[in-house]
Structures are given as structure tokens and as C-alpha cells.
Amino acid sequence: MDYKLTDFLPTTKKECELRGWDELDVILFSGDAYVDHPSFGAAILGRILEANGYRIAIVPQPDWHGDFRDFKKLGRPRLFFGVSPGAMDSMVNRYTANRRMRSEDAFSPDSRHDMRPDYPSIVYTQILKKLYPDVPVALGGIEASLRRISHYDYWKDELRKCILCDSGADLILYGMGERSIVELANAFAEGKTMDQIHEMPQVAFYCKEKDIPGGFKDDDIILHSHEECLHNKKGQAENVRHLEEEANKMHAQRMIQAVSYTHLTLPTIYSV
């Protein structure tokens, strides 16, 4: 079967022009190659956004060295940037359990192992924030979802803060993102403020204590602070237990964790 370039989500400026687009609503950056198949999460989310009327492009495996031309080639989106490390956790994908670099990457052309950096969620977001500081960046994928609170990093053998702190992203869409990314796009398209977006389920974000939506509530789960977890292993274990328990509830409770002078807030998941 013959396919045209316009049958796929655009990855270059030329492909956008073939569709008659002079502006994009959302630009997705992925640590994987772009394959229009359900095995590749960025492709799924791109197609879902497209089906909801948004102009979407994907930048697969951008070059993070040099002049960052891959991050500039499509310009700034109207709504936001989406960043995903790929279908697998990038560190598991790049390294063995003995911390030796793998010789192949199953999600890259020709199985090349040098097509993504360590922690692409952090690297890509820091570059985007340097180039477009006023454009919101939403993290997604397994890498961000598993690092949405203080977490033990096996590769560096240390307890690290939520990935929002290291990356500088505005929020995390954790878990399965098909529903939340459309709601996020709709919210930005309607001109909603970041405070209003913070009320959405499956969104993790940082804010000052005075800016926590609705303030502290009786049914909130207050996690041990990051600073406390650095000296209290049981506190970290309790945090992870709460995270796992709430992730499997039909009606989850909001979780809040203090990190330095800010608070990480994780609203509830969607009700089924």
C-alpha cells in the first residue's frame, strides 16, 4: 500500500507545509524513533490529539548537542510542548543492571544506542525552557510517572527529588495520558490559567503552600518531605506505599509532598 507524507504526523517543517499548516498547537518530543504504531506512545498521543482537531507534530530523537536545531526547527507551539523519553525508562533502555551501556536500542533506527541522552525528560525540557521559557512543558511517559515524588535512583545510588525539580517542566501527566493530554490541550485552548489546570486529575505540579488549590484538605495524604526522606528510609517507604495504594483505587486521594520551599501536589486520578 502506498502512503503519502501527509498520512503521517509531521516531523519536519516541510511536512507541516504539505498540510497547509503555518502554526502548530502541540509539539511532542520523544526519545524513541517515530513509528506510527500503538507500541510507540508519542504516536498514540499525537493521533489522539489530531483526532480532537489539534495540529500536532513529533520531533523524534532530537539532537541535544550543538546549536539545538532540532528543538528550533518547528518553532514554538500555540499551546504547549510535550516531552516523553520513549516507551521504556531511558536508563533501563540504555544500561544493563550492572550499569554497563547496552550495545543496542530496540526503539532507534538500526538499533543505534547513541540516539538519546541519559534522562531525556530532563535534557529535552531544559533545552526547551532555555529556548522558549514562556511556553509550558508537560512531561509524560514512564520515566516521569515513576519519578513524580522523591525516588531512589539506582544509576546514581541516591535519593532524588521529583523529576519536575531537575527538569524545570511545568507539570507531569502521569499514568496513561490519552485522556489527560486532550483535557490539557482543551484547557490551554480555552485560555485557562495554570491554577485552573492544576485542578485536573493525573497532573503533578509544584506550587507554594499558599497556592495549593483549595488549601490543605482533611482527606489529603501528606507525604514525608524530601528532606525528611533523605534521613528516614521508612518515611520514603511509606511514601511509595501511599503512591502505589492510591494508584490502584477507584477514588484516590490527593497527595502532597514538601520539597525545599515548595510543595509537590498530585491530584486524584480519573474516576472510572
Per-segment meaning from a language model:
Residues 1-20:
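Short N-terminal or domain-adjacent regulatory/targeting segments
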Residues 44-56:
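Short helix-loop-beta junction
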Residues 25, 55, 136:
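Residues at the starts of beta-strands that form the adenosine-phosphate
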Residues 33, 41, 60-264:
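Glycine-rich beta-alpha loop elements in corrinoid/cobalamin-binding modules
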Residues 20-26:
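A short, charged/proline- and glycine-enriched loop
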Residues 14, 28-32:
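Long, low-complexity, serine/threonine- and charged-residue-rich intrinsically disordered N-terminal tails
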Residues 263, 268-272:
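Single conserved hydrophobic/aromatic residue that forms the stacking wall/gate
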